[in-house]
Curated annotation (Swiss-Prot):
SUPFAM superfamilies: S-adenosyl-L-methionine-dependent methyltransferases (SSF53335). Its EC number is 2.1.1.173, 2.1.1.264. The gene is rlmL. Transmembrane segments: none annotated. Belongs to the methyltransferase superfamily. RlmKL family. It comes from Xanthomonas axonopodis pv. citri (strain 306). This is Ribosomal RNA large subunit methyltransferase K/L.
Length: 711
């Protein structure tokens, strides 16, 4: 049987892992939740034990729902006397999108009407509605004409643990607090004898959740007490009581063994008083030390290692500023340099303001507030050890080093004039050393240099031993010239096999580096994929478009990681719309926007096949960028071939231009031939390829071609 566990956006993969650990047969992350395969007992166990889920929904029926009449009819077909006892109360939560029914409250009312009418026809008493504490809470998910009616097995939001008696302003939800603790590695740290510290603890949510986690206390125990979460007639009461009995025994053992290694402080005495009250109700007051203390007065904790968790203030009411975050970062480096930190910051800029180097970064949501979670391990990065004395380069490596130095000198004035921090330093300049070397300078921290080396396919006539030797010589030269250690060199090397040469497996480091281009901060991943998230050859075209976008509407088709959208937004675009079929790339685009403080309704992300979307869209734009792939054969859209489809694509894009608007079209297909006669039927077209190539790509100027189109 399949059921659904919802969660805050950003917690999906953590929740999937948690549900698998709790016994689910399969758990697949989706947007704001997890699709789960398991029995009713697995779903009820999730209600009792999940620290991350918002709700656990057990489906009753699913049906096509084009309109309100179909909704009523689909609900009325259910035998409601098998689900709702006489005299029991009812409530319905509804979520609708992409359907003819646009109002969730109206949809909920139609479901209530159908249930009431059905029970009346059966000669049963009319059920009453109780929004706060119903016996049966139903959930409607109506998306794109498909309705799912489910029982909310938990009877309401699972983040309510039952211990919160008092709170300061802007509380943190308990399931998000659990995510901060899990991402920070608190369960393992506690098992290893480490401590837990929150220097801005507020009402104590993170520390209390951490204590309950360490004590192996089921989150649902205090929430439900001796009651059952739902009085749905299908609820397995005997199975629930067995789960509760097992949880109570684990609770008894865990609380008895709970170590006093948790410390919290806050400058607000009212917040500390609330935290103590909450800890008392949760039964962990003896395990947590609370004190009134300003961040800068924080003392070195008694444990040598542990986890610092913190949710510094960040919304408008609390008027947080970068100075507070900087003070927090400085203090943590002073008092707990070898600890790990898991900090839930208001946004990426505030996270950057801490001055801490984040090994991992996550985008989370505290209610409707978008946040940035950074994990630093350790808090104080060890000082860089000097690079080992370089060994003498071979003759071949010395040739590469000389060419690299020559190129750097050639690009020096151009880079200084244009503020170029990421560029191509070498592009098979020496044919026998056939690779590209791209330089990425970190925009934050100590502005480290990273190298991205992409090996080109060698002719089959060259012995494999020579190919490997030359690649090693090229790498040695690059490390010496740029003075970078091997761990900051991302190598995409080719392996020979059946079918010719192909790229081997990449590293899976999940390491994000922030770089800067045209004033915009951008996230790149140099190690995990063939592409980094930033196509350097399009740099001048992005700059041209950004200059033209101030106060104008920008459309980015096949947007990839959204770099052009971000740079347009930073330059003052009135709005940006970014379209791509890939949810992964759209999330990357969203992260790039957030990194620049640009997330919001002005910057729209659309997951769709770009051509189909264009032909259905009616909005107009002032500047459009269209950079399609050469081929695409996604299972979710029609096969795409740029040579075959470009006239149709450009016609649809030009139709979306506002008066005076301009379309920039680019692609990298080396054998591409523009159908000039076909395009001339609807647009004026000028090839601008030479103007879109910067000095670092002049050696291979046909890396892309570009055109400017107007209606």
């Amino acid at each position: 049987m399949k059921f659904f566990a919802s969660c805050a956006k950003g917690l999906e993969y953590l929740l999937a892992d948690e549900l698998l650990a709790l016994g689910a047969s399969r758990a697949t992350a989706t947007i704001s939740g997890v699709n789960v395969e398991g029995e009713l007992r697995d779903a009820q166990r999730a209600v009792l034990w999940s620290r991350l889920a918002s709700r656990v929904l057990w489906p009753l029926t699913e049906f096509d729902c084009p309109d309100e009449d179909a909704l009523y009819a689909g609900v009325a077909e259910l035998p409601w006397d098998a689900h709702l006892s006489v005299g029991h109360t009812l409530s319905v939560d509804a979520h609708v999108s992409g359907t003819a029914i646009t109002h969730a409250r109206y949809a909920a009312q139609r479901i209530k009407d159908a249930v009431v009418d059905t029970m009346r026809r059966q000669g049963l008493e009319r059920p009453s509605v109780d929004v706060e504490n119903p016996d049966l809470r139903l959930n409607l998910s109506l998306r794109k004409g498909r309705a799912t009616i489910s029982v909310d097995l938990g009877g309401g939001p699972l983040h309510r643990r039952g211990w919160r008696m008092a709170q300061n302003e802007a509380p943190l939800k308990e399931n998000l607090a659990a995510a901060v603790l899990m991402r920070g590695g608190w369960p393992r740290a506690y098992a290893d004898g480490g401590g837990l510290l929150d220097p801005m603890c507020g009402s104590g949510t993170l520390l209390i959740e951490g204590a309950l986690m360490a004590a192996d206390v089921a989150p649902g125990l205090q929430r439900y007490g001796s009651d059952v979460p739902s009085r749905w007639r299908g609820f397995d009461r005997d199975g629930w009581q067995q789960l509760v009995g097992e949880a109570r025994e684990r609770d008894r053992v865990g609380r008895a063994a709970l170590k006093q290694v948790i410390h919290g402080s806050d400058m607000d005495p009212h917040a500390i008083r609330a935290a103590k009250e909450n800890a008392q109700v949760a039964g962990v007051a003896e395990a947590i030390w609370f004190g009134v203390r300003e961040v800068g007065e924080l003392q070195t904790p008694p444990q040598a290692t542990g986890v610092v968790v913190c949710n510094p203030p960040y919304d408008e009411r609390l008027a947080a500023d970068a100075a507070l975050y900087r003070r927090l970062g400085d203090t943590l480096q002073r008092v707990a340099p070898q600890w790990r930190a898991s900090l839930l910051c208001g946004n990426a800029e505030l996270a950057y303001a801490t001055g801490l180097r984040a090994g991992k970064k996550y985008q989370l949501f505290n209610g409707a507030i978008e946040c940035a979670l950074i994990v630093c391990d350790p808090i104080a990065v060890p000082r860089r050890t000097p690079l080992a004395a370089p060994t003498a380069l071979s003759e071949g490596a010395q040739m590469v080093a000389n060419r690299l130095r020559k190129n750097l000198q050639k690009f020096k004035k151009w880079r200084a004039r244009e503020g170029i921090e990421c560029f191509r330093a070498y592009d098979a300049d020496l044919p026998e050393y056939s690779a590209a070397i791209d330089v990425y300078q970190q925009a934050d921290g100590d502005r480290r240099i990273f190298l991205h080396v992409q090996e080109y396919a060698a002719p089959a006539t060259i012995p494999e031993a020579d190919v490997r030797r030359r690649l090693n010589e090229l790498l040695a030269a690059a490390r010496e010239v740029f003075e970078v250690p091997a761990e900051r060199v991302a190598l995409k090397s080719r392996e020979r096999g059946k079918g010719g040469s192909k790229y081997g497996r990449f590293e899976q480091r999940n390491e994000i580096v922030h770089v800067r281009e045209h004033g915009a901060l951008l996230r790149v991943n140099l190690f995990d994929y063939l592409d980094t998230g930033l196509f350097l050859d399009h740099r001048p075209l992005r700059g041209t478009m950004a200059q033209q976008c101030r106060g104008r509407r920008f459309l980015n088709l096949f947007c990839y990681t959204g770099v052009a959208s971000v740079e347009a937004a930073v330059a003052g675009a009135a709005s940006t719309t970014s379209v791509d079929l890939s949810a992964t790339y759209l999330q990357w685009c969203a992260d790039n926007l957030a990194l620049n403080g640009l997330a919001g309704s002005k910057h729209k992300l659309v997951q769709a096949d770009a051509l189909a979307w264009l032909e259905a869209e009616r909005a107009h734009f002032d500047v459009i960028f269209c950079d399609p792939p050469t081929f695409s054969n996604s299972a979710r859209a029609e096969d795409f071939d740029i040579q075959r489809e470009h006239v149709r694509l450009l016609r649809a894009a030009v139709a979306r231009l506002a008066p005076g608007g301009v379309l920039y079209f680019s692609n990298n297909f080396r054998r591409f031939k523009l159908d000039e006669e076909g395009v001339a039927e609807f647009a004026q077209c000028e090839e601008i390829s030479p103007r879109t190539i910067d000095p670092d790509f002049e050696r291979h100027a046909r890396i892309h071609r570009a055109w400017r189109l107007t209606a």
